[in-house]
């Protein structure tokens, strides 16, 4: 069924297709239809970050930026759902067109630029959702906030989402917000993480609960830089790392239509880079905090490879667009088969 739906959706522009798909998944969720249309994945419970997941396969941030289809995605069988990236204030993102399909490579290039309706709008949708499972909220900075003041935006978002999120992801790795990736390095990263840890401690006292903080990083760092990130995460008491965001590399898409578009490349071509980053992190972290792997999972075996590389959970986005909900079940089955 999804193969036919994809053929129809791919006749539309990528962003129109995305918006329509989100509307359909959201409507299906409100009507309780999505679970009837998709065979549920097997139960494969796992405890990560002190949270109980029914299975280790989640939705990556970016597909549902505003929390418009939380119930719909949950009904498809995801073990957890991550929404966002959300910013303190609404912003339109970059000019269109800003999403490009590369179907021959099972890849997508996007330069969306954190388009979203703002954190208050997102929280209203979270409140309206019936979903009671693990919900991650991914936070970022507004485009017009100077990078040296980025921490202000992260703290505003953390304050607002804390009571409503199972965990919070801090996005410092999108390539589409100028200067953002500089926050992954050296003293900038350590100061940001320290400020977040301090605020989280205050919020934990206020709300009477500990909400885990995850940091999402890029696949384009050297092994040494990745190792330095790992040490900073340990030193500041972060709870998890998500590896990885999209890549600026164009290896695997050279010469293809849209292959030279600006933005972050996701899908199959980023798989090896992302998995390598997972392996480096696993070596450096030594089990001190868990890794959530994202990047290039287009078949179930790729999810199992991420777990074998050292991840505790996986997330899918581009693979979901190309393969549909069946990829969730296929990934859970592949992970279970390797246990």
Curated annotation (Swiss-Prot):
Residues given in the record as substrate binding sites: 65, 110-114, 171, 176, 245-246
Cofactor (UniProt): FMN
One Gene Ontology CC term in the entry: plasma membrane
Catalytic residues in the record: 174
Entry note: cofactor: Binds 1 FMN per subunit.
GO BP of this protein: 'de novo' pyrimidine nucleobase biosynthetic process; 'de novo' UMP biosynthetic process
Reactions performed catalytically: (S)-dihydroorotate + a quinone = orotate + a quinol
InterPro entries in alphabetical order: Aldolase_TIM, DHO_dehydrogenase, Dihydroorotate_DH_1_2, Dihydroorotate_DH_2, Dihydroorotate_DH_cat, Dihydroorotate_DH_CS
Top-level division of the source organism's lineage: Bacteria
Pathway: Pyrimidine metabolism; UMP biosynthesis via de novo pathway; orotate from (S)-dihydroorotate (quinone route): step 1/1
EC code: 1.3.5.2
UniProt cross-references to Gene3D superfamilies, sorted A to Z: Aldolase class I
Major subcellular location class: membrane
Topological category with respect to the lipid bilayer: Peripheral membrane protein
GO molecular function, one term: dihydroorotate dehydrogenase (quinone) activity
Binding site for FMN: 61-65, 85, 138, 171, 216, 244, 267, 296, 317-318
Listed SUPFAM superfamilies: FMN-linked oxidoreductases
Cell compartment(s), UniProt: Cell membrane
Keywords: Cell membrane, Flavoprotein, FMN, Membrane, Oxidoreductase, Pyrimidine biosynthesis
PANTHER family in alphabetical order: DIHYDROOROTATE DEHYDROGENASE (QUINONE), MITOCHONDRIAL (PTHR48109:SF4), DIHYDROOROTATE DEHYDROGENASE (QUINONE), MITOCHONDRIAL-RELATED (PTHR48109)
Assembly: Monomer.
Similarity comment: family membership: Belongs to the dihydroorotate dehydrogenase family. Type 2 subfamily.
Function: Catalyzes the conversion of dihydroorotate to orotate with quinone as electron acceptor.
Protein name: Dihydroorotate dehydrogenase (quinone)
């Amino acid at each position: 069924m999804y193969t036919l739906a994809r053929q129809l959706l791919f006749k539309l522009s990528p962003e129109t297709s995305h918006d329509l798909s989100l509307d359909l998944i959201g409507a299906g969720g409100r009507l309780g239809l999505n679970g009837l249309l998709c065979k549920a994945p097997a139960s494969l419970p796992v405890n990560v970050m002190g949270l109980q997941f029914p299975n280790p396969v989640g939705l990556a941030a970016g597909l549902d930026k505003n929390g418009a289809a939380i119930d719909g995605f949950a009904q498809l069988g995801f073990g957890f759902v991550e929404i966002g990236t959300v910013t303190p204030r609404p912003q339109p993102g970059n000019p269109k067109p800003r999403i490009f399909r590369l179907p021959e490579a099972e890849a997508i290039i996007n330069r969306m630029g954190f388009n979203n309706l703002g954190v208050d709008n997102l929280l209203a949708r979270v409140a309206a959702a019936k979903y009671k499972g693990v919900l991650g909220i991914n936070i970022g900075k507004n485009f017009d906030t100077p990078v040296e003041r980025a921490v202000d935006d992260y703290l505003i978002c953390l304050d607002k989402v804390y009571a409503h999120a199972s965990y919070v992801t801090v996005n410092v790795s999108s390539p589409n917000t100028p200067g953002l990736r500089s926050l992954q390095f050296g003293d900038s990263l350590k100061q940001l993480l320290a400020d977040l840890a301090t605020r989280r401690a205050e919020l934990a006292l206020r709300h009477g609960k500990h909400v885990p903080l995850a940091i999402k990083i890029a696949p384009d760092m050297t092994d040494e830089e990745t190792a330095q990130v790992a040490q900073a995460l340990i030193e500041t008491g972060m709870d998890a790392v998500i590896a990885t965001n999209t890549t600026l590399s164009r290896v695997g898409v050279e010469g293809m239509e849209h292959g030279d578009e600006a933005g972050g490349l996701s899908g199959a071509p980023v798989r090896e880079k992302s998995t390598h980053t997972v392996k480096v992190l696993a070596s450096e972290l030594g089990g001190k905090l868990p890794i959530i792997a994202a990047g290039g999972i287009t078949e179930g075996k790729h999810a199992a490879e991420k777990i074998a590389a050292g991840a505790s959970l996986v997330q899918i986005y581009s693979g979901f667009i190309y393969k549909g909900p069946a990829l969730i079940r296929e990934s859970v089955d592949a992970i279970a088969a390797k246990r």
